[in-house]
Amino acid sequence: MLQRGLSYGEGPFVIWEDIDMRTVCKPGHPVPYSLHDMRVSDITLSDGQLTLQFETGLVRIAEPCVQVDGRVVLTGVESCEVWRLSPNGEYGSFSGKKQTWEKFSRKHPEFSFEVTDELYGFNQVRYEGYLSLPDREKLTEFCMAVYYTGDLIYETEE
């Protein structure tokens, strides 16, 4: 049985050390806003800066959890790739496509993307959800993976 001893940590992790010489790391939420269920209306990538615009803003994680107008900016972007997978997230076999953001956006200048999951790691972020294209009735499971060496910035109206 784990007996918690010393607890410490800043930022996205809280770490406990116990008397059995084990270290348990519990990831925390590293960001102040949630993008869950938010619809991305525009994405631009220029000069190493990726900007995501949202139809209805972002949700502040701290109480009170309110929705605020804002956008997400990543600086120092070195790569941005997207995966298009199964229609409506169906199980079973599927065919997909992996592309750079530049190639995808040239072919699909009009789209919307509803974020259902956000994953954050060292110099990387991944947004997953459903892509809507004007010429397709069904939503498509979609993933955007970004590797960056700069900052993750939330520009909000508050």
Q: For each predicted feature, which ranges?
A:
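Small/flexible residues
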Residues: 5-6, 128
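Generic early N-terminus positional signal peaking at residue ~5-7
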Residues: 6-7, 26
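Targeting/processing segments of secretory and organellar proteins
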Residues: 2-5, 11-13
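Surface-exposed, interaction-prone regions used to assemble/regulate multi-protein complexes
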Residues: 13-158
